[in-house]
UniProtKB/Swiss-Prot annotation:
Residues 236-249 have a biased composition (Polar residues). Belongs to the tetraspanin (TM4SF) family. Residues 37-99, 154-183 are extracellular. This is Tetraspanin-18. May be involved in the regulation of cell differentiation. Its main location: membrane. Keywords: Membrane, Phosphoprotein, Transmembrane, Transmembrane helix, Vacuole. It holds the Pfam family Tetraspanin.
Length: 270
């Protein structure tokens, strides 16, 4: 496939946007590694007393009750009812202590993977790669939108999460609340970069997936060439007798010059 200036310009812009997103992903991974290093140096904070006061009997009953009434359990998850102890609670999950750091690092790795696929798609300018990148980018944007909507709707979202012994979740929330204006503009800029990269990928894929006009133009370019060869071949065939006549004239002149055409004299009979 031929790459015109429009393809190259769109691909270069997509590479720049992916570079910005890769910088964000690498920054998240580096910050997660720093948090994990700081957590390993210091002792973890003791869990709240409510988490340590649960007995084995209560845990067994809380696990067996949803199995006895599965319909009520599913309805409580969908409707979000707090009646009884059937509501799904993330605090009941057995997660490692630095779960927030691992989750934060997973977000950075996911961003880097999607960005790497975007680099490949922008370099190859392939329809399949661009389509796959567009799907991944759409899923990532939808996941971010769902997370923001959940935090905006549920004012007590921290109570639904497991306890964070590292304290990084609370410190991150305090930092965002102190610099809410800057964080808003940074979030808007990140979302704008992601949406613009998705738009460029879709436009570039649409441009790549329609190569038929280019093939027609190539065929039209080839037909005039074949037509131009026809008149050139025709006169050459017609010029062949003229060339042979010139050779005959030249040979006849040579014979006349050297007397080769003169017939020998005939002796008269006496």
């Amino acid at each position: 496939m031929r790459r015109n200036c429009c393809h190259v310009s769109f691909a270069s812009t997509l590479k720049i946007l992916n570079f910005v997103q890769a910088f964000i992903g690498v920054s998240i991974i580096i910050y997660s590694i720093w948090m994990l290093h700081e957590y390993s140096r210091h002792l973890p904070v003791d869990p709240p007393p409510s988490a340590s006061s649960s007995s084995g009997t209560e845990i067994a009953t809380s696990v067996s009750e949803p199995l006895k009434n599965p319909i009520d359990f599913v309805a409580s998850i969908i409707l979000g009812s707090n009646g009884g102890d059937h509501g799904f609670n993330l605090r009941s999950l057995d997660l490692p202590a630095p779960w927030f750091i691992y989750s934060f690092m997973a977000v950075g790795i996911l961003v880097c993977i999607v960005t790497f696929i975007g680099f490949i798609a922008a370099e190859a300018i392939n329809g399949c790669c661009l389509c796959f990148y567009s799907i991944l980018k759409t899923l990532l944007i939808l996941l971010e939108a769902a997370l923001v909507a959940y935090i905006a709707i549920d004012r007590h979202w921290e109570k639904d999460l497991p306890y964070d012994p590292t304290g990084e979740l609370s410190s991150l929330r305090a930092f965002i609340e102190e610099n809410i204006d800057i964080c808003k503009w940074v979030g808007i800029a990140v979302v704008a970069v992601q949406l613009l990269s998705l738009l460029l990928a879709m436009v570039l894929r649409a441009m790549v997936s329609t190569p038929k006009p280019e093939l027609d133009e190539e065929e039209d370019d080839e037909n005039p060439r074949s037509r131009t060869w026809d008149p050139l071949l025709g006169p050459q065939g017609n010029q062949a007798p003229a060339g042979s006549s010139k050779i005959e004239n030249w040979s006849s002149r040579i014979r006349e010059k050297y007397g080769l055409n003169q017939s020998p004299p005939v002796n008269p009979k006496g």
